[in-house]
Design a protein with these regions (language model features):
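Sec-dependent signal peptide recognition
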Residues: 1-8
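A beta-rich soluble binding module of mature secreted/lumenal proteins
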Residues: 15-163
Length: 163
């Protein structure tokens, strides 16, 4: 678990910028974004390599930030891995632009650039550049046609498809 957290930290350390063509959603409603999200697709990175059944749980912190609990199953070890972090808003709570830290003062960008309205049932998320991408859903299984449409949107925005 410590290795999972440290690799995530190192991969995102100091990377709070955003890709030029990616714009955070506006009129973001943090309280509606809270709760459990299921990872439907991603661009693989060392901190998630080999993990399946990945979830992200977001809850409100007393300081106004967001608690982040990422969890995934490592089939190689046969164990669940979990990493706990915190997120803060970069440009105000009404924009889907946050910075996330899993260790100390090191933050990485978390940019929600497409979000289901009004229900917040899916989200497209970028990191500091287009090598970081996640498709998240409120349910562990997504309608295949919707999944394809969202992945096409990601590709049109410069993300590489890995499935």
């Amino acid at each position: 678990m410590i290795r999972f957290t440290l690799i995530a930290l190192l991969a995102l350390a100091g990377c709070t910028g955003k890709p030029d063509n990616i714009k955070p959603v506006t009129d973001f409603r943090p309280n509606e974004y809270l709760g459990t999200w299921y990872e439907i697709a991603r661009i693989d990175h060392r901190f998630e390599k080999g993990l399946s059944q990945v979830t992200a749980e977001y809850s409100l912190r007393a300081d106004g930030g967001i608690k982040v609990v990422n969890r995934g199953f490592d089939s190689k070890s046969g164990q669940w891995k979990q990493s706990i972090g915190k997120a803060r808003f970069v440009e105000g709570k009404d924009k889907g632009y946050l910075k996330v830290s899993f260790f100390g003062p090191f933050y990485g960008a978390y940019i929600v650039f497409e979000l289901d309205e009004p229900g917040y049932q899916y989200a497209l998320v970028s990191g500091p550049d287009t090598s970081y991408f996640w498709l998240l859903s409120r349910t562990p299984i997504m309608d295949p046609a919707l999944r394809e449409r969202l992945l096409d949107t990601a590709v049109a925005n410069g993300f590489k498809r890995e499935d």
